Amino acid sequence: MITSTSNDRVKRVVAYGQKAKARREDGVFIIEGMKMLREAPVLQVSEVYVTEKFVDTASEGDKEILWRYGAETVSEEVMNKMADTQTPQGVLAVIRQYPYTLEEVLEGYNQSASGKENAPLLLILENIQDPGNLGTMLRSGEGTGVTGIILSKGCADIFSPKVIRSTMGSIFRMPFIYVENVSEMVKELGTKGISTYAAHLKGKKSYDEFDYTKPTAFLIGNEGNGLTKETADAASEYVLIPMKGEVESMNAATSAAILTFEASRQRRG
């Protein structure tokens, strides 16, 4: 059992939770809780830590999973130190990052798993800063059939603990890549036959007036400033989400969910 918060392994795990640089250098991230561990791809699980208290009350199935991964027992104090949450669940794991390619983003996890070929449905996110928004977009994206997500370098770190929690497990099933130049990527997608729609207050047509049954990508911008002009202008069309009252625009994550749900609705026929 690890009982010292000064232990080198503990310090390393703490760094993974607190520093994007540490996660990036070692190609890992942290998850908490048994539910997330169950959903993690086996080959991506690197290390597992658990408290005696959790083991004492765990089901036989959960114990089997923990021992299969060679879980290391730690004291409550150590778990509190390593965990990002205020009230840790008693299970924490170090997960290897998976390096997706653009091809995997276009193809999508769900299509690969089902063997069905559907038109790509993408989210292109520019400078999304709020971890909760980013995690929610992954989760709602999975639920609405998004095949993959393309992020600008200015977006929040997708591997931060807050983003990971917000995905509710979708982090393991939603292909994504970061790109240096979003507007250039939008243009590249156009050469691949993918129509790109920028969520924008200057849109002349409502989002539900377009056909999204063909290869489609939605562009969502920063929570406060929206899309940069360069990126918005690279899109095939501007789309507007009509609002009532004095509300000017939707939350970024809500906008993404509305647009991708409409695409999902159309594709259901």
Which ranges hold each PLM region?
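Short acidic-hydrophobic, aromatic-tinged amphipathic segments that line or gate anion-handling sites
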Residues: 1-4, 70-75, 175-182
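Glycine/small-residue-rich loop that forms an oxyanion/phosphate-binding "nest" at active or ligand-binding sites
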Residues: 64-96
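Short beta->alpha connector loops at strand-helix junctions that form conserved
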Residues: 74-75, 126, 152-153, 175, ...
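Acidic/glycine-rich phosphate/pyrophosphate-binding loops and surrounding catalytic core
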Residues: 86, 90-91, 95-117, 155
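Structured adenosyl-cofactor binding patch, chiefly the S-adenosyl-L-methionine
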Residues: 143-144, 158, 163-171, 229-269
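Active-site/ligand-binding-proximal alpha/beta "capping" segment
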Residues: 197-246, 251
